[in-house]
Amino acid sequence: MSKGTLFDKVWDSHTVGMLPSGQTQLFIGLHLIHEVTSPQAFAMLRERGLKVLFPDRTVATVDHIVPTENQARPFADDMAETMMQEIERNTQDNGIIFHKIGSGNQGVVHVIAPEQGLTQPGMTIACGDSHTSTHGAFGAIAFGIGTSQVRDVLASQTLSLSKLKVRKIEVNGTLPTGVYAKDVILHIIRTLGVTGGVGFAYEFTGTTFEQMTMEERMTVCNMAIEGGARCGYVNPDAVTFEYLKGRDFAPKGADWEKAIAWWQNIHSDADAQYDDVVAFDAAAIPPTVTWGITPGQGIAVNQTVPKPEEMAEGDRELAAEAYRYMDLAPGQPISGTKIDVCFIGSCTNGRMSDLREAAKIAKGRHVADGVKAFVVPGSERVKLEAEAEGLDKIFEAAGFEWREAGCSMCLAMNPDKLQGRQISASSSNRNFKGRQGSSSGRTLLMSPAMVAAAAIAGTVTDVREML
């Protein structure tokens, strides 16, 4: 059992009590909500005559169903418009902060909370979205939850949870040129598997993470859930504090100094005990691309689709399904695979540093004939900052479409969808069957820079050849 880790310290400091089931009743410091998983939760509160207990600890935005082109109301999609009206009504009725379209603060929930300073070290955070683990980059313990749990947090500001084990994932060294945070987490998931983290929280540590920016750390923690871990986190340090200082909701004045003292105290102890430890060498991590139908089916961009005999016996059945669905043959090079659509964005890779790296590849080049490529900033703030730097002009000159903020084609609950058997190069987090809007559409996950390279070449391409 882990002891002396950040996870233990934050968990213990937020424990309200132990339940007869053996679970912990955990206080939730920040509850983030959006338009998809909150309407039913609010309806259940109304049915029981309950109010939101701590509206000041609840923040809402719209992201999943938001069009990234025509955002005029009412939306063309009736269901999307209904969801918009519901979250507008629910937040107004309950006195909850709501970052609506055009407010300057709207965007993907896991992008806007950090950029506003809402996400802070030592917090417990919940959201009705799988990728809530993103916020662990700040040294928070953040859980994705279902609609019934959204209801519970709204009503009681607590969750009933079983305590997780803690796995230390140590990555040391400097990443090679052309290798990014996205490659790090895809490599980890490829190695440990999509179920390898079940029952665990992942603590990401080592000199590689110390060298990362906060946005890079967010990319890694975002996809901890794809490796089966309920949450992932990085211990807060000077990089964390510098990022937070001066942001809208960050502590100010004397409160800032008090916060720093607390944040430093929750760092995992030097002699902390872990339930498992895994180590990686940063120098050995390549630009990585998924070839199959889970984020764990990944290979280096210069490798071939693995053959069944190269796999563990338990992985072969899923691989056979992936070969058929993706129309890729064992032994086939992934480089050179034709691409139809290129998507840069999402809560994984829709931040400024992601757009800057992609723009470096796009600048002075042009999207290949027959390829549809578009860039979706993770928030309205990111969009404005990118435009101030001229990134929009670089992308547009290269033939990319420049869109409004939203989840877009990460999950296609909006107009941005694949058509038929199209195959996409995507900077998002999931490559499940039908994930991007077409029941037969195919997705290859990779870093934003790799997506930009694929857009230019028209095929999966090693980004290092364009640097």
Where are these regions (language model features)?
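Fe-S-dependent hydro-lyases/dehydratases of central metabolism
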Residues: 1-467
